[in-house]
């Protein structure tokens, strides 16, 4: 036996190729869904974040009969990608335009590359990208793969043509081993849920069976886009600080550094923080020792008077668009939504939005249907391990007037943040961070109070209607007695008069109470003798 271990290192590309399930590529069905998601989310980030109304086309075609290989294409009308970054954006794991403090769907710089790595494991065609940045005179195209060992793009083809039409946007096609029958319901669910939260987008979807579904744009109103912000002092650590300091000019002082590089820090606040850390405000920041850096971080984390992190970096959907999306999809009897005030955790701002829909076309079931969203991404898998589920499970709906055994209820929760605490790189569930959990609970409770008012009104109306229906039951008997009275007992005249009286009385009550045909049928089924 040898006690010698062999040590080597691997590239990030190699790591995700070896562990595709960490990024959501655990089997062909899931991979199909995940690859589609990554492309659609990039397409949406390239549009609404830049105030472009999204038009997204998704096409899945089967290309091989022997193996289940599919060609997945997603086209957008977004800002496009500068040609010099295309190879790295699609061929270098952990390369992104989204490593800044601003709410976007993308966060890790991994998604599309994880899809490419999965793609090239089971078939040999490269990914194809066609793109034109805004105002570009040319349209660029690339075919590439990833060199897994070096974590670098390998370019197979590149070219460009004139852009005479002012086109801008990106089209990406990739070939992947999939399992359509197993992926189908999740893929459709994903598109439906994406549509609910982006009613200002239009989608065209063609599935591999040839079915085409169009999701029309419901409104031209778009959420206010997020702005990039500086870090908040509560969110720093020693490594981040060192990294930021390494980019400063040599003569930048500690005070200047704090004021220039962080949000919520003016001169006065900077001086108080530096005093708390026991440092000299005029010292050059690059000269701070490790010990001094550690003291500065402690002071920044514990200083009590910073303004909370700026919500400008966030982009909520807003109650009206949430209601629009829910109405369109579920045709409910009741819909309501709230956008909570901004809160913060670990130096990151976050906002919770909650939408509730009840009754109408919603299929009743033992548990409410929960729609989870983070930064406008629908989360479909791993529902039960999500903090949203944990909170929803604890809600006692009876307190809000919902007595049904089977609930016709949809609960939608949207978390916006510059950092969503996902449990994995596949972005399917949110970890239970205390501050977020509390805010989700408060959001659901706030939205439920309006639902309760609606339920109370509805119950009152139902009770009043029931009482009145009971009165209605007496009409035939009353009409009969009156007809005998009016006709002085002339038996041959009585039935006709009785019918006339009865119809008039019914008309009167039906009009007054706005009784629907269904209830009228119910009334007609009553017999005096059953009273
Ligand atoms: N359709 C597109 N339009 C514009 N830019 C795009 C498009 N697709 C990809 N990109 C660029 O490529 C980069 C890398 O995308 P990728 O999916 O790998 O990671 P990400 O979106 O940054 O983060 P995440 O891993 O969280 O999805 C993006 O940050 C974006 O700049």
UniProtKB/Swiss-Prot annotation:
Transmembrane segments: none annotated. ATP binds at residues 42, 76, 97-98, 106-113, 427. Keywords: ATP-binding, DNA-binding, Isomerase, Nucleotide-binding, Topoisomerase. SUPFAM superfamilies: ATPase domain of HSP90 chaperone/DNA topoisomerase II/histidine kinase, Ribosomal protein S5 domain 2-like, S13-like H2TH domain. Its EC number is 5.6.2.2. Disulfide bonds: none annotated. It is an enzyme of class 5 (isomerase). One of its GO terms (biological process) is DNA topological change. One of its GO terms (molecular function) is ATP binding. The keyword tRNA-binding does not apply. Homodimer. Heterotetramer of two Top6A and two Top6B chains. Belongs to the TOP6B family. HAMAP family: Top6B. This is Type 2 DNA topoisomerase 6 subunit B. It comes from Metallosphaera sedula (strain ATCC 51363 / DSM 5348 / JCM 9185 / NBRC 15509 / TH2).
């Amino acid at each position: 036996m040898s006690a010698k271990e062999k040590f080597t290192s691997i590239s990030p590309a190699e790591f995700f190729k070896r562990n595709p399930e960490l990024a959501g590529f655990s089997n062909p069905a899931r991979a199909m869904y995940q690859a589609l998601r990554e492309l659609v989310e990039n397409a949406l980030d390239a549009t609404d974040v830049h105030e472009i109304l999204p038009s997204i086309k998704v096409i899945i075609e089967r290309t091989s009969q022997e193996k289940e290989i599919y060609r997945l294409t997603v086209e957008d009308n977004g800002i496009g990608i500068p040609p010099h970054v295309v190879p790295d954006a699609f061929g270098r794991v952990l390369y992104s335009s989204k490593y800044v403090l601003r709410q976007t769907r993308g966060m890790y710089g991994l998604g599309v590359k994880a899809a490419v790595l999965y793609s090239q494991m089971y078939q040999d065609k490269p990914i194809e990208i066609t793109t034109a940045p805004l105002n570009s005179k040319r349209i660029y195209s690339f075919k590439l793969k990833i060199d897994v060992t070096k974590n670098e793009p390998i370019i197979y083809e590149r070219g460009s043509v004139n852009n005479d039409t002012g086109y801008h946007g990106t089209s990406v096609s990739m070939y992947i081993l999939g399992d359509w029958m197993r992926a189908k319901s999740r893929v459709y669910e994903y598109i439906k849920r994406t549509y609910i939260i982006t009613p200002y987008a239009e989608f065209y979807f063609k599935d591999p069976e040839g079915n085409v579904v169009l999701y029309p744009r419901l409104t031209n109103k778009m959420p206010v886009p997020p702005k990039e912000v500086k870090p908040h002092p509560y969110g720093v650590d020693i490594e981040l600080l060192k990294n930021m300091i390494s980019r400063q000019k040599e003569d930048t002082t500690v005070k200047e550094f704090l004021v220039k590089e962080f949000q919520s820090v003016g001169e006065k606040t900077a001086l108080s923080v530096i005093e708390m850390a026991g440092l000299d405000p005029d010292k050059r920041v690059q000269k701070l020792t490790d010990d001094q850096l550690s003291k500065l971080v402690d002071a920044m984390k514990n200083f009590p008077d910073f303004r909370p992190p700026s919500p400008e970096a966030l982009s909520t959907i807003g109650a009206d668009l949430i209601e629009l999306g829910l109405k369109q999809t579920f045709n409910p009897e009741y819909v309501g939504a709230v956008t909570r005030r901004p809160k913060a955790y670990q130096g990151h701002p976050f906002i919770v939005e909650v939408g509730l829909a009840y009754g109408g076309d919603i299929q009743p079931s033992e548990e409410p249907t929960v729609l989870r969203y983070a930064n406008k991404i629908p989360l479909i898998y791993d529902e039960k391990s999500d903090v949203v589920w944990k909170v929803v499970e604890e809600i006692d709906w009876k307190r809000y007037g919902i007595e049904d055994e089977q609930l016709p209820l949809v609960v939608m929760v949207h978390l916006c943040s510059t950092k969503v605490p996902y449990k994995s790189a596949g972005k399917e569930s949110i970890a239970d961070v205390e501050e977020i959990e509390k805010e989700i609970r408060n959001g659901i409770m706030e939205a439920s109070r309006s639902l309760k008012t609606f339920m109370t009104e509805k119950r009152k109306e139902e009770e009043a209607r029931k009482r009145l229906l009971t009165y209605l039951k007496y009409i035939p008997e009353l009409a009969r007695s009156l007809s005998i009275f009016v006709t002085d007992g002339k038996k041959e005249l009585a039935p006709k008069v009785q019918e006339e009286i009865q119809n008039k009385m019914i008309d009167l009550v039906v009009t007054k109470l706005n009784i629907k045909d269904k209830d009228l049928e119910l009334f007609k089924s009553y017999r005096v003798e059953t009273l």
